[in-house]
Each structure stands twice: as C-alpha cells, then as structure tokens.
Curated annotation (Swiss-Prot):
Main location: secreted
Disulfide bond as UniProt keyword: yes
Region forming the signal peptide: 1-20
Entry keywords, A to Z: Cleavage on pair of basic residues, Disulfide bond, Hormone, Secreted, Signal
Disulfide bonds: 34-165, 46-178, 164-169
Induction: During squamous cell differentiation. Repressed by retinoic acid.
Signal among keywords: yes
MF-aspect GO terms: hormone activity
Family statement drawn from the similarity comment of this UniProt entry: Belongs to the insulin family.
Source species of the chain: Oryctolagus cuniculus (Rabbit)
Name by which UniProt lists this protein: Relaxin-like protein SQ10
A single Gene Ontology CC term: extracellular region
Length: 178
C-alpha cells in the first residue's frame, strides 16, 4: 500500500512539472533536423505550445484564459466580406472613406496568425513589426514578383522537411503542423 502511494505521488509530481516556458529566442533558433528528428521536433514544439496555452502566466497576457476575441456570427462575417468586395469594386470612392472602413476591421494577415500568436511568447509589438515587414515586402513588389513570392512560399511549405534537413529552419515554421 505505501508503494502505491509513492507511485501516485511520483505521478502527480510528474504531471505538475512544467517543461519550461517557450521563449522567442527558442522559437527563432535555426535547427537542422532530418526525418525522425523533424517529427520529434514538431511534436516538441506543439507540446510546448499546448502547455503554454494550458498554463498561462500573469506576465504573458496573450496566454491568459478567457475569450480571445469577440464572437461574431458567421452571417455577420459574410456580410462584412460582401461589403468589402462591393467597396473595392466602386472606382470613384474617396480614399478617406475606404481607409476608415478598413481600419475598423482587423487585417486578414493578423487573423491568420492570431492562433499562433496566442500560443507563442512573442509580444504583440514584435508581432506587429513582423506583419508590417511582410506587408511592405508584398506591397513593394510588382504583380509578377508577388506571384513569384507566393509560388516560392508555396513550394517552400510543400518541402519544409527537406529544407529543414538541408539548410535548417526556425522552430516556429513547425507550428503549421500543430
């Protein structure tokens, strides 16, 4: 009977042990991983992110429990998207009006990365800088360069294990497998 209690105590201690906080530096670290190591590292990254979400800390507001965003019915989202497409199709609409309308709605790029942002230890300001750099890069290129960029990004995503094996990749690239 006492041995069972010791096993239960050990199990409880192991369950309560936190493997460590995910830091920005750890996620940005470039690692060269191949085959089984790639899968192990992806599982490790997903596990760290899951643990961070389950045990939020007061110093990291993105990981706090509670509603992350206002819940909006899908019909309202569809109406907003329809309104946006209609606004874009009007050729003589003043720029001030369209600018104020688009400022009220969050960027689609921001919404795309919102789940990852909540799971990571990256501050909101750092995240905004990253998004702005991405937007500047896409806006600064011509249409043909933009298509090339999109194609290159797609090809990189399809062969991520090979790229990580040959050249290495930051751990945050593995978040797409979570």
């Amino acid at each position: 009977m006492p041995a069972l209690l010791f096993y239960l105590l050990g199990f409880c201690l192991l369950q309560g042990q936190v493997t460590g906080r995910v830091t920005y530096e750890w996620m940005m670290e470039n690692v060269k991983i191949c085959r089984n190591d790639f899968v192990r590292t992806a599982i490790e990254v997903c596990g760290h992110v899951h643990l961070e979400r389950e045990s939020p800390s007061p110093e990291n507001p993105f990981l706090s429990s509670g509603p992350a965003a206002e819940t909006v019915p899908s019909s309202i989202k569809k109406d907003a998207e329809n309104a946006n497409t209609m606004l874009e199709s009007i050729p003589n609409l003043p720029q001030e009006l369209t600018a104020t309308l688009f400022e009220k709605q969050p960027s689609k790029l921001y919404l795309q990365y919102l789940p990852t942002l909540k799971k990571s230890n990256v501050s909101f300001e750092e995240f905004k800088k990253i998004i702005q750099n991405i937007q500047r890069g896409v806006q600064g290129s011509s249409a043909s360069e933009s298509n090339t960029f999109s194609r290159k990004k797609r090809q990189f995503s399809e062969s991520l294990p090979e790229e990580c094996c040959k050249y290495g990749c930051p751990r945050y690239y593995l978040l797409m497998y979570c």
